[in-house]
Swiss-Prot record:
Annotated TM spans: none
Binding site for Zn(2+): C185, C193, C196, C199
GO molecular function: ATP binding; ligase activity, forming carbon-nitrogen bonds; zinc ion binding
Protein name stated in the entry: 7-cyano-7-deazaguanine synthase
Pathway it works in: Purine metabolism; 7-cyano-7-deazaguanine biosynthesis
C-alpha cells in the first residue's frame, strides 16, 4: 500500500494539526489547498509558508469560479460575517453550499493520481451543528462512494471528527506545534477580529487549555 496521502490543508488550526499528525505517522504527505473565493484567503499564505518550511509538496488550486454557481455565503459573498459563538444559528450564513463534497472529490481525484489510498481533512465535533458536510454520516456516505468511484479505492480520514477544537489543540500542543503559523479568522483583515465564530472558538480552545494564543487580534 502506498504511503502517499493527501491532506486538505486550509491553513487553519485543525488541518494544521492533521497535517502534522499524518507526518508523524510516517505518511508521505501531499498538501492540497483551495482558493474558492473565500474572503479569508490569507489562510492560504499561512498554508504555503508551513509547507515550505516543512518541505511538504503543496498545491493551491483556484476554483473561485464556482462562486457563480454557489454564492450566498458570508465567506464568499458580500454578506457580513456574523459575530458570536460558533454554534449559534447565525453562523449558518458561513456555510458554502456543498463545499466539502466538492473539495473532497477533487482531493480524491488527486489521491488516485498519486496512487494514494487516503485523504485527510480536519472535520471536528464543533462543526457538526452548523456544517452538514463535517458530520460523521456525511463522511461515511462519502467513503461508500469513494470505494467504488475509481479503480483505486480511497478512504477519507477524519482523525478528529469526534473531538472538539479544544481537544485538537491539546493534541497539537502536546506535539509542540506553533499555532502562530495558522490563521482562523473568517475576516481577511491584517489581524484576526476576535469576534467572529471561528475566532471565538479558537480563543475558547486556548482558554480551555490554559494557553496563550500567539496570533495577534484587533
Amino acid at each position: 500500500m502506498s504511503e502517499n496521502v493527501v491532506v486538505i490543508y486550509s491553513g487553519g488550526m485543525d488541518s494544521f494539526t492533521v497535517l502534522h499528525k499524518a507526518l508523524r505517522a510516517g505518511k508521505k504527505v501531499h498538501a492540497l489547498s483551495f482558493d474558492y473565493g473565500q474572503r479569508h484567503k490569507k489562510e492560504l499564505d499561512y498554508a504555503a509558508a508551513v509547507c515550505t518550511s516543512l518541505g511538504v509538496p503543496h498545491k493551491i488550486v483556484d476554483i473561485s469560479a464556482i462562486n457563480t454557481l454557489i454564492g450566498g455565503s458570508a465567506l464568499t459573498s458580500d454578506i457580513d460575517v456574523p459575530e458570536g459563538h460558533y454554534e449559534e444559528p447565525s453562523m449558518k450564513q458561513t456555510v458554502v453550499p456543498n463545499r466539502n463534497m466538492i473539495l473532497l472529490s477533487l482531493a480524491v481525484g488527486y489521491a488516485v493520481s498519486l496512487d494514494a489510498n487516503e485523504v485527510y481533512y480536519g472535520a471536528h465535533s464543533g462543526d457538526h451543528a452548523i456544517y452538514p458536510d463535517c458530520r460523521p454520516e456525511f463522511v461515511h456516505k462519502m467513503n461508500d462512494v469513494c470505494g467504488i468511484a475509481n479503480y483505486t479505492p480511497v478512504t477519507i480520514m477524519t482523525p478528529y471528527i469526534k473531538d472538539s477544537k479544544t481537544a485538537i489543540l491539546t493534541d497539537g500542543l502536546s506535539m509542540g506545534l506553533d499555532y502562530g503559523q495558522t490563521w482562523t479568522c473568517y475576516n481577511g483583515r491584517e489581524k484576526a477580529c476576535g469576534k467572529c465564530g471561528a475566532c471565538e472558538e479558537r480563543l475558547e480552545a486556548f482558554k480551555d487549555n490554559g494557553a496563550t494564543d500567539p496570533l495577534e487580534y484587533e
